[in-house]
A protein has these predicted regions:
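A residue-level marker of the well-folded mature domains of exported/periplasmic proteins
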Residues: 2-8, 18, 23-279
């Protein structure tokens, strides 16, 4: 099946599901992360394609993003409140920071707004009666990543979190730790300030400093494709390309190129287009 055919299949199935559920005329707000984060462009492509079906059935879709990750939790809560105030009948949103998002989503649900969860926050769904969750099991994905790097000979894995406190990112690195341990290796977590998110130079310097401070680190796993680019640069600057194994969550052209030429060990994809389309 080609990707084009697959998209048609998904579109047909989604349309049928909407018609059966009676939800096809809803006004929906989709809330995602920073406008500076390229990951959300892939999610938005899925949202845009699904919007065509929603609009064809009399509904609307409003796409909202935070400006950055500096004040992430409060910004997300504000966007949830904004969506409710604007009359959204449904909100599709990841729940990265439950302490900020869950109360706002509970209030939205109590007001009759349907909640769809995607990308992060599967464990929080029951708190606001979310209809469904579209995304990966972050813990199992992390375990798989930790096991794979260890199976390739890594003994000490650095797991880099670019947005500390985000549930999905913390869960991924916990999985990496446990997966590495199961396979005879160890992993530790490097949390950097959220204002370094999307900062290639700052992130590369932070990774490089860790590698210099601890020469026993022989693998790095990042939780975003852009961060893997930053790590690749740090590793290259130290003359350790191929010596320090590199892995990441999410795909990009540069990630695939490094895997192809043997300078990156692995990547774990979470299908951002489908997350946006289905949510």
């Amino acid at each position: 099946m080609t990707f084009k055919t697959f998209k048609k299949f998904i579109a047909t199935a989604a349309t049928a599901a909407l018609m059966v559920s009676g939800a096809y005329a809803q006004d929906v707000t989709v809330i995602v992360g920073s406008a500076q984060d390229g990951f959300w462009n892939m999610v938005k492509k899925g949202v845009d394609d699904a919007t065509l079906m929603v609009e064809a059935n009399g509904g609307t879709v409003n796409f909202l993003q935070t400006q950055n990750y500096d004040n992430f939790g409060p910004d997300l809560a504000s966007l949830i409140e904004q969506a409710v105030a604007q009359g959204a009948e449904g909100i599709a949103i990841p729940n990265w920071l439950p302490e900020s998002e869950t109360p706002a989503l509970q209030a939205a649900s109590d007001a009759g707004v349907k909640i769809m969860s995607f990308n992060a926050g599967q464990s929080e769904m029951a708190n606001y009666d979310a209809l469904n969750y579209f995304g990966s099991d972050e813990y199992l994905a992390g375990v798989a990543g930790g096991k794979y790097l260890a199976s390739q000979g890594a003994k000490k894995i650095l797991c880099h979190i670019q947005n500390p406190g985000a549930v999905n990112l913390e869960t991924r690195c916990k999985g990496v730790e446990d997966g590495a341990k199961e396979t005879g290796a160890e992993a530790y977590i490097l949390r950097v300030p959220a204002n370094l998110d999307q900062d290639m130079v700052g992130t590369s310097e932070a990774i490089k400093s860790e590698l210099i401070a601890d020469p026993s680190i022989d693998a790095v796993i990042n939780l975003a494709a852009w961060a893997a680019d930053a790590s690749a640069s740090a590793i290259d600057q130290l003359g350790k390309t191929g010596e320090i194994k590199l892995g990441t969550f999410d795909m990009s052209a540069s990630v695939l190129e490094r895997i192809s030429n043997g300078t990156q060990a692995m990547a774990i994809d979470q299908q951002p287009y489908l997350q946006g389309f289905l949510a």
